[in-house]
Amino acid sequence: MGKTYSSPVNPIPKAPKGLAIHHWLNFLQAAYRLQPGPSEFDFHQLRKFLKLAIKTPVWLNPINYSVLARLIPKNYPGRVHEIVAILIQETPAREAPPSAPPADDPQKPPPYPEHAQVEPQCLPVLHPHGAPATHRPWQMKDLQAIKQEVSSSAPGSPQFMQTVRLAVQQFDPTAKDLHDLLQYLCSSLVASLHHQQLETLIAQAETQGITGYNPLAGPLRVQANNPNQQGLRREYQNLWLSAFSALPGNTKDPTWAAILQGPEEPFCSFVERLNVALDNGLPEGTPKDPILRSLAYSNANKECQKLLQARGQTNSPLGEMLRACQTWTPRDKNKILMIQPKKTPPPNQPCFRCGQAGHWSRDCKQPRPPPGPCPLCQDPAHWKQDCPQLKADTKGSEDLLLDLPCEASHVRERKNLLRGGGLTSPRTILPLIPLSQQRQPILHVQVSFSNTSPVGVQALLDTGADITVLPAYLCPPDSNLQDTTVLGAGGPSTSKFKILPRPVHIHLPFRKQPVTLTSCLIDTNDQWTILGRDALQQCQSSLYLADQPSSVLPVQTPKLIGLEHLPPPPEVSQFPLNRSASRP
């Protein structure tokens, strides 16, 4: 079954996309001449055909209806053939020169001269006394004067509309003139919005009917460009001015809302600035008095607000607010001099630190000298904290003594999850000191004192010893040994060990910089070389005890139940020293 089309609700169907309004009005006038009248189905087929015809290269302006009739397919549904045939019949009559006098001069006797087709003008129209209407070019000084008057006004504001309306009345511009004036005065966005609103107003005016407007002679914009069509030109000018009042966004202009009264500005001057800003920012027709009264109180300074609140005139008429604040004058602010303490004059005596006069010792820029020689290197020129021997070499990374096999990826991921989901601290590479379960923790080191060459020696790593022990043969001959008491595993000892209050340097195989100790114990019997916790803490190293593979002991069936069949337990020698030294 075919589609059912009801009677049109809107008597004026919408024009197809891409077709000018005046062309669509020509098709509508021809369609309404059909007997019987057209249906909605006829308008639907007409719009469908025109959409296809617009895309063809034969679509011209003005339209050649004879060529257009050839594009209609045979047996095309609807009454499109009849509508185009009516337009073909009306075309010669419309193109014929007028045989009647123009409406502006009905008293002119015949014969009437044939008016040649005038090209659309783009300049203001001049109406000299006793002469036909002509055009003259826009002068730059006129355009600049108009733009200077509206430069501080928003498009659509009362001051803007007043200036533009006076310019339109003085120059009597055509449609093309108004378009050029809009491009010169406003931005591209405002011009685009104005053009859209103007097209809507023109479509409504052409539909309702305008005195002297002929739809077959072209759109209103083209007819308004004719100097002789003064009535149509006035109608187009009114529509062009009305399009400014419907521009969106003019009421949201925040320039006038940000005007504040200064702390010393008179209230009358502040209200005058508000009044000018509202004239330039508010669109035409918007009530200005309520906004002006509200801003005059809310944007005033605190002193004027207190005066208006005390008199109950926060929302009174503007004249009463001006009279209330008329007697107010800015307060005189006395300048207060800041009292500053007088500086103590510099002394005439020399500084106790640098020996120069002109400043106190507390203001001296020379650093304080050390009280004595450095206890590490015996240099009297610097403090102990500035000793170069304490400054570690942070540029180079320390080498590992032992390369351990890397863990498997799944083991490392499981550890990261247990330690906090993979969040790790910055990497720090520590040297590893390997130990053996079968041997004592022995490490080959080199020991040196000030102005002596390093001497190699085998040292025992003892984490239980508080202080490092060195044999007596490594001690320099001029050393000043002091008596001390050492508490070890065998009890206190007072004669076996001496303390050496002298810096000693221990070179480890896994460090580039030596470990410097301020003092150490000297074994007078030349028996022990022990690295205590004082040296190991400076190493920042880790002790590594390798896992030994498990071994299966041969077990024979015992004849008797007991432990006689098992081998004797291994004998492990104990560490010979676990002592603490007390320094004098």
Curated annotation (Swiss-Prot):
Motif interval(s): PPXY motif: 109-112
Active site: 462
Biased amino acid composition, Pro residues: 98-113
Keyword terms: Aspartyl protease, Capsid protein, Eukaryotic host gene expression shutoff by virus, Eukaryotic host translation shutoff by virus, Host gene expression shutoff by virus, Host-virus interaction, Hydrolase, Lipoprotein, Metal-binding, Myristate, Protease, Repeat, Viral nucleoprotein, Virion, Zinc, Zinc-finger
GO CC terms, sorted: viral nucleocapsid
Bias type Polar residues, positions: 575-584
Motif mapping: PTAP/PSAP motif: 98-101
Ranges for region Disordered: 93-117, 564-584
Xref: SUPFAM superfamilies: Acid proteases, Retroviral matrix proteins, Retrovirus capsid dimerization domain-like, Retrovirus capsid protein, N-terminal core domain, Retrovirus zinc finger-like domains
Coiled-coil residue windows: none
Superkingdom classification of source: Viruses
GO biological process: proteolysis; symbiont-mediated suppression of host gene expression; viral translational frameshifting
Name of one Pfam family that matches: Gag_p24
Zinc finger (CCHC-type): 349-366, 372-389
Its biological purpose: Matrix protein p19 targets Gag, Gag-Pro and Gag-Pro-Pol polyproteins to the plasma membrane via a multipartite membrane binding signal, that includes its myristoylated N-terminus. Also mediates nuclear localization of the preintegration complex.
Subunit structure: Interacts with human TSG101. This interaction is essential for budding and release of viral particles.
This protein's domain notes: Late-budding domains (L domains) are short sequence motifs essential for viral particle release. They can occur individually or in close proximity within structural proteins. They interacts with sorting cellular proteins of the multivesicular body (MVB) pathway. Most of these proteins are class E vacuolar protein sorting factors belonging to ESCRT-I, ESCRT-II or ESCRT-III complexes. The capsid protein N-terminus seems to be involved in Gag-Gag interactions.
Protein name per its UniProtKB record: Gag-Pro polyprotein
UniProt source species: Human T-cell leukemia virus 3 (strain Pyl43) (HTLV-3)
Lineage: Viruses, Riboviria, Pararnavirae, Artverviricota, Revtraviricetes
